[in-house]
Every structure is written in structure tokens, then in C-alpha cells.
Amino acid sequence: MNSEKRLSRIYKENRSGTGKEESTMQVTKTVEETRKQIKAWKKEGKTVGLVPTMGFLHEGHASLIKKCREQNDIVVVSDFVNPTQFGPTEDLEAYPRDFERDSKLCESLGADLIFCPEPSEMYHDPHAFVSIDTLSETLCGKTRPIHFKGVCTVVTKLFHIVAPDRAYFGQKDAQQLAIIRKMVSDLNFDIEIVGCPIIREEDGLAKSSRNTYLSPEERKAALCLSKAVKAGQEAIHAGIPAEELLGKMRAVIEAEPLAKIDYVSMVDALTMQPVEKADRSVLVAMAVYIGKTRLIDNFSYEV
């Protein structure tokens, strides 16, 4: 079953299961109207959960919204393609967008509000940035040097606008999750950060909005990422040192002609710094180009 059919199924299954007789989901486009509504909910003593997204939602996002729905009185989803986290040669303009589709899915999952601002609502030139050093300098940060500065900035702004009790992030973006946790701790945000498991296609490919870029041939080739994850998991449980483990993963990827490795690394789960063996909790992560499309995947190992 393809992703669109599965999303349609999610919509149908959840449409009558949200506990609401009719839809009351709101759509806001400005900071002022968003804050006004959330303040009203908080005045009633309601808890608020936030699911930050860049839209073009898939089943991974749906899992975050479901978890948020379970744990909070109010579910807020932000739907904003954040320009500050894209480099000058990256896919900002090409990034997939379909707000009508996103809205339908959010409504079916019981979201109470979608915040979908224009870039001009979120940023005024010149504007301040938030950055987290060290954690953002490895893995994706090495080849996307401005990415996490943009992520931290927009997430900080969303936290101030929505003032959530909890915020939900997927573990597929494991480095992002670690950076957000560090930022929340360092800047004393009174927000619980909830990490949610990677959601995969039936054949193992991690869900991503960028999967839509892939041709049928590239889609098959992209399975080298999940195959490399499996090889890495087997190696780490066998006690194989990092260098050999990463070599096994690279060999799986390099066997696919359409794949080009950006990085394959083992890092400390907290500091994001490279380690030589799994004698602590580690993250094994990769970024791989399939054709022109950059995909990421990872797995964690807890000690």
C-alpha cells in the first residue's frame, strides 16, 4: 500500500474517533491570533502540545500528532517551511507543499489548531538567530553549516508563540532532537521534549517528505539506507568496533550504484562527538544521496 493510500486510511479511521461531534480545528496565520487562542485555552487550565512540522505530512508526522493527542488537552501543529534552515543550493523552492492535504490529516487526527504563517510573519530583516555550538558541528552540521541555526531559531520562536507544555519530534532527525533538548535545557524552557520512534515504509525505508523526489528506480535504491541500518545493528550487538561496523554499513551503501555517501558515523548520543566503540549510549547515523535527493537514517544503542 503506498503512502497516499495509507494517509487516506488514517483519515478515514480517525475522522470519527477524535471524540468531537464536529470539527473545531482552527487555522491561524499570525502570531497574534495564535497567541490569543492559546492564552484562552490556557486560561481554562488546558495543557498544550506542539508538533512542529514543515508540512507535506506523512505517517511519521501522524504518529507525532497521535502521541500529542494522547498526552495533551490541546494539539497545535505548525505547518511552516522554514527558509532559514535551507542553504543557498538546497531545495527550499522545490520542497513539497500541500496545505489542504495537511489540514485534512490534522483534522482527522484531532488537532485543535494549525499555525501556518508566511515567512514574513516569522522573520523581519534583520533578525536574531539562536545557535547551539558543538552538537551542531558534526553529522548533518558538517555539510549543512547553517541548518541547525535555522532550526533552533524557528523552534525557539514557535516555543515563544505557542508556549507548549510538551513538544514532539521524530527520532529520524536524531541530531536535531539532541540539539533541541540541549537548547531547552540551556535556555530554561519549561517544556517537555518528547522523542518519537522512526516510522518506516513496509520495506524499511524511513518516512520522509523528500521521498516524493525519488523516481521508481531511486526509490528501490534508497533501501540501501535501511539495509545499512540492519547491518550496523547486527554488528553493534556482536561487539564489533566502530571502524569495522561503519565499514560494513558503507559497503552496503556503496554496493548501490545510485547512492553517494555524505557521512556514516557513530557518535556519543549526548555530545554528538565521534566515538571508537559503543561503551556508552551512541547514535549511529548516516546521510546518503540517492541521485540528487539527500536522505538520512539512524539507530541508537543504549548502554
Annotate each PLM feature.
Residues 22-258, 267-271, 299:
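Nucleotidyltransferase catalytic core that binds NTPs
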Residues 10-24:
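Short, Lys/Arg-enriched N-terminal segments with co-localized hydrophobic residues
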Residues 248-303:
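Phosphate/ribose-recognition catalytic cores of enzymes acting on nucleotide-derived substrates
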